[in-house]
């Protein structure tokens, strides 16, 4: 760095560059700079005239280039907040989205505070959904499944750092590891993006298998609707996240496999993103 440059000037310059790839350019710049100087964000506001040394400037430049290349902030910082928990994330896991908190909220509405139910999270990734439910319903026993050993390693790390012990993590393909078991509630944020969706390009840094679900984006949801009746208790609850444009198709799939009391819920943007259904074994035998 040929000349001294203040924190405020670095923030302005960085935010201007990041505006091309981020809707939260100033925040991204603050987080990256705080990381580069190994100080909390509040330090930036209290010391805007302080200058950066060469080592900090080099660290900032490296992370800026990663962000400008489209890498999610969560992968650069290694963490993402979800349900007021700071979760570890890695390129082996999807970055937890704020809209997925709706899925947690819908599930919790149906689970009494003192319930001791068996609950299953399919495709757990970083463990965000399972950890949120396990923390809110500490008498329940959660089982969280993912096909990726690397994702499960991250999920276990999150459970350990949050000291949440009422979760078992299993590796396998969807319901296969729990064949013969029964659960009162099953939750899942499965892949639901069509392989032809142009949005995949903007999500290229994230694991494609956790996003893409066949030609129409409904392959995984169809599999869950078909297979979950075998492992759900009578009148058990299924809660799924899906694309905003998939509301009617998801309802049709659920009905075709005998699910009842199907409801859809809008996220904070007014988009239909989560559906729930119950399965009554007594009415399908």
What do the predicted segments below correspond to?
Residues 191-220:
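Mobile active-site "lid"/loop adjacent to the S-adenosyl-L-methionine
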Residues 216-279:
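Conserved Class I SAM-dependent methyltransferase catalytic core
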Residues 281-285:
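Flexible, glycine-/basic-rich loop-and-beta segments that form/coincide
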Residues 1-37, 42-45:
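Non-catalytic accessory regions of SAM-dependent methyltransferases
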Residues 18, 111, 159, 228, ...:
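Conserved hydrophobic residues forming the short capping helix/wall of the S-adenosyl-L-methionine
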């Amino acid at each position: 760095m040929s000349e001294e440059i203040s924190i405020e000037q670095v923030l302005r310059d960085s935010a201007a560059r990041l505006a091309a790839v981020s809707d939260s350019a100033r925040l991204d710049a603050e987080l990256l700079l705080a990381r580069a100087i190994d100080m909390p964000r509040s330090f930036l506001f209290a010391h805007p005239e302080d200058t950066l040394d060469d080592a900090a400037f080099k660290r900032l430049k490296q992370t800026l280039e990663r962000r400008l290349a489209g890498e999610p902030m969560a992968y650069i910082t290694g963490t993402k907040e979800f349900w007021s928990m700071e979760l570890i994330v890695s390129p082996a896991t999807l970055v937890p989205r704020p809209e997925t908190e709706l899925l947690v909220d819908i599930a919790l509405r149906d689970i009494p505070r003192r319930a001791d139910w068996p609950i299953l999270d399919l495709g757990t990734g970083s463990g965000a959904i399972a950890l949120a439910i396990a923390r809110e319903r500490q008498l329940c026993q959660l089982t969280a499944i993912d096909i990726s050993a690397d994702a499960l390693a991250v999920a276990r790390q999150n459970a350990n750092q949050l000291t949440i012990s009422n979760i078992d993590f299993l590796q396998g393909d969807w319901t296969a590891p729990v064949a013969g078991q029964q659960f009162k509630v099953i939750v899942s944020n499965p892949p639901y993006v069509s392989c032809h969706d142009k949005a995949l390009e903007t999500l290229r840094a994230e694991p494609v298998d956790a996003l893409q679900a066949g030609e129409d984006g409904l392959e995984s949801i169809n599999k869950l609707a078909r297979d979950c009746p075998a492992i759900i208790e009578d009148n058990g609850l299924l809660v799924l996240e899906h694309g905003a444009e998939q509301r009617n198709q998801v309802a049709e799939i659920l009905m075709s496999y005998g699910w009842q009391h199907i409801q859809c819920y809008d996220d904070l943007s007014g988009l239909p993103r989560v559906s729930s259904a119950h399965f009554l074994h007594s009415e399908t035998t």
